[in-house]
Amino acid sequence: MILTAVLTAAVLAGGGYFPTDIGNRLTQTVSAAKKDSDKKDDTSESEGSVLDQATLMYQQYNYDEAIKLLKQQDDFDTNKDYMDLAAKCQVAKSTLVEYPLEQITHVFFHTLIDDTGRAFDGDSKSGNYNQVMTTVSEFNKIIQIMYDKGYVLVSPHDMATVNDDGTMSRGKIMVPEGKIPFVLSQDDVSYYHYMDGDGCASKLVLDENGEVKNEYVEADGSVSVGDYDLVPLLDTFIKEHPDFSYHGRKGILAMTGYNGVLGYRTDIAYKTGENLQDDQKKFLEDNPDFDYDQDVADATKVADAMKAEGWEFASHTWGHMNATERSAEDLKTDDQKWKSYVAPILGDTDMIIFAFGADIGDWSGYSSDNPKF
C-alpha cells in the first residue's frame, strides 16, 4: 500500500511524462502483489494458530478435539504438519487408560502468603495463618513435586456429568499410564479486609496483556502487579508445563460474598451502606471515591477472563456458614444472597465446597427428607 501510494503521488505531481495506462497497470500490479503477500501471511498465521491450538490439546491429552480441529481445515489432506500431528494424537490416544474415579484426591489451599515477615508478625492472626495458610514458596515447591510425580489437574465435571433429565452419570477420565488425576481448589478468594497489610495479594486484576494477575501492596505502600497468589502462579506453571492440565483444566475457586469477590467490594452492603461491619466501614471511609458499579464491572471482567482460561467457581456459601450447624432456613437465605450478589459476577455454579468442611449430611449420604438437601 505504501508503494502504491508513492507511485500514484508521482503521477499526480507531474514534472515529467508518465503514461496514465502504464501508471494504472503498475498500480494494479503492485496492489495485487501486496494482496497476494497479505494472503500468504494470513494463511501462515492461521496455520500457526491452528497448529498451536492442536499442539496444546495434544499436550493436555485432548486428542479427539485436536484431531477434530486439524481435520476441519480445508488443506488437511495436503498439510504434512496437520497430518503428522493428527497421527501422533491417534497413537497417543491408543495408550490411554481409564483412571479410577474413587482414587482421585482433592488438594486445596487458602490465600497464599508472600511476605512472611508481615504475616507472622506476632499479632493475633499469626497463629491462624501458620495453621491454615501456605506461603508462595511452599506452594511452588508443592506443585513442582506433584508435577514430577505425575499428577494432572482434572475437574469434578470430568468425574460426573449431568444428564438432560437431571440425573447424573459417572464420567470417564482417560490418561497415560502413570498419571495421577487430582482436583485442586482454593477457598475464600475474596481477599478479606482482615488480611490487609499481612503480606498477601489484595485482588485479582487484568494486566496490560489481558492476563489475570494479582495486585499486591508492598510494605512501603507501593503497588505491584504479578504472580502473588494461586491463580496466576498456576497459570504461569501450566504455560511452562501444559501437561499438568487435563483438557485445559485449572482449579475451582470456592467463593463467599460478604466482603465481595476477587478483591472487589461487590456485596450490596458497600452500595447501600446498610449492615456494615467495622472493617467495611473503615474501607468506605478510607476510599471516599469508591465506585460500587465499577467494582462489579471490573470483577466481572476478571471472572470472565478466568473462566476462559479453564478456572471454575463454586459456592462457599455467601457468609462462610457452617452448614452442619445452621438451619435449613439460614442456608436458604444465605444461598439467595449468593445468587443475588455473587452469581451475576461469577456466573451460576453447580458446585459447593462447604465452609469449615461442614457437610449437610453424614457418611451415609444425602436423603430427600433432609431439608438442607
Per-range role (PLM):
Residues 1-23:
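Sec-dependent N-terminal signal peptides of Gram-positive bacterial secreted proteins and lipoproteins
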Residues 21-95, 102:
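N-terminal, intrinsically disordered, polar/charged segments of Gram-positive cell-envelope systems
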